[in-house]
Design a protein with these regions (language model features):
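Membrane-anchoring hydrophobic helices of lipid-metabolizing enzymes
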Residues: 2-129, 174
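Proline-centered loop/turn at the N-terminus of a beta-strand
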Residues: 21, 124, 149, 199, ...
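Conserved phosphate-coordination/catalytic loops
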Residues: 21, 106-109, 180-184, 223, ...
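Non-catalytic C-terminal accessory region of glycerolipid acyltransferases
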Residues: 53, 144, 173, 184-297
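Short, flexible loop segments at the rims of nucleotide/cofactor-binding pockets, characterized by
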Residues: 101-107, 176-181, 219-220, 267
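Conserved beta-strand termini and adjacent loop/short-helix elements that scaffold enzyme active sites
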Residues: 110, 153-155, 180, 258-260, ...
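Catalytic core of membrane glycerolipid acyltransferases/transacylases, capturing the structured
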Residues: 121-182, 210-212, 217
């Protein structure tokens, strides 16, 4: 596939993303000139090959489905194949949005009014999400519909040549990226965004070795979650909601938001609420769990 999360099959995420510039070029060409349908058809071939030869992520997912979600072996194998295919679709969809083909997609938004209420309060909003579904596409859908500006906090881990090609070929993302850096400048950027009544979206599911964490029960097992996103959610005087975007049809997405947290809470308290919601989403969309490493220590 054109992008794979680093350390697939390892014990924690290493923050790196691998990708093929040639792969991006091929799919961008097909999307632009032959359409999404043809790109999806090509994707079936690519992901079948990936399923056969990418042993580590395949084994990790099989273990997750079988031993964590208690799904039978045959069904688990089908889920793994579907997982790889939908993950590929999310990458194709992301490129399609950036190429201006957003009208080919439809979406529903569960509790959209929560985000509208957050916007009206004028304090900005912190949106915690996970590597489940396709948050980048959600960011593209939200901009202009609910807020003029949305910021996504992430490790700037894409291969630079791919990032440059995507910017050159598509005109760039419709949302701002706040890169996490060692000098903590991202904290200042988050603060400024909230002051300007902007939304700030953060993935809160991936723990990196050596980072501070909170250990919580998740799907019946102990798992480490990064404490940083929850400290940010607790520190700033802005409403906090958990937002997810799952693919629910060939060209459609289902977005959802939880009732905003507007009272002061400890980071660990917010983390527990987040994990409870994440559990629901994983059970609802098991084929869209895109963490290809051993999530449980």
């Amino acid at each position: 596939m054109s992008r794979q999360d680093g350390n697939a099959g390892g014990n924690s995420w290493n923050g790196k993303t691998r990708g093929s510039l040639t792969g991006y070029k091929i799919f961008l060409f097909f999307i632009q000139f032959l359409g999404l349908g043809f790109a999806y058809l090509l994707l079936r071939i690519v992901t079948f090959y990936y399923y056969l030869f990418a042993a580590k992520p395949r084994i990790v997912l099989l273990d997750f489905y079988h031993n964590t979600l208690q799904i039978s072996g045959k069904t688990a194998r089908k889920l793994v194949r579907r997982n790889f295919y939908i993950f590929g679709q999310t990458l194709v969809d992301r490129a399609a949005f950036l190429l201006g083909k957003d009208k080919e997609f439809t979406h529903t938004f569960e509790n959209e009014e929560y985000l509208i209420d957050i916007r009206e309060k004028g304090k900005g909003g912190i949106l915690l999400s996970a590597h489940l579904g396709n948050w980048e596409t959600a960011g593209n859908l939200l901009k202009g519909r609910i807020t003029p500006t949305i910021n996504i906090v992430m490790l700037d881990a894409e291969v630079e040549s791919i990032k440059q090609y995507m910017e050159l070929s598509t005109g760039g993302s419709r949302f701002k990226i706040i890169a996490i850096k060692n000098d903590l400048s991202h904290i200042i950027a988050i603060r400024n965004a909230l002051i300007n009544n902007e939304f700030v979206a953060i993935h809160a599911d991936r723990y990196m070795e050596g980072a501070k964490f909170t250990e919580l029960d998740f799907l019946g097992k102990k798992a480490k979650f990064p404490i940083g996103p929850f400290i940010i959610a607790s520190k700033f005087d802005a409403p906090v909601t958990f937002v997810f975007a799952a693919k629910d049809g060939k060209y459609s997405y289902h977005l959802s938001a939880t009732l905003p947290i507007t009272t002061k809470m400890k980071p660990e308290e917010i983390a527990k609420l987040y994990v409870a919601e994440l559990e629901k989403k994983v059970r609802q969309y098991p084929e869209q769990w895109f963490n290809y490493f051993n999530f449980f220590q």
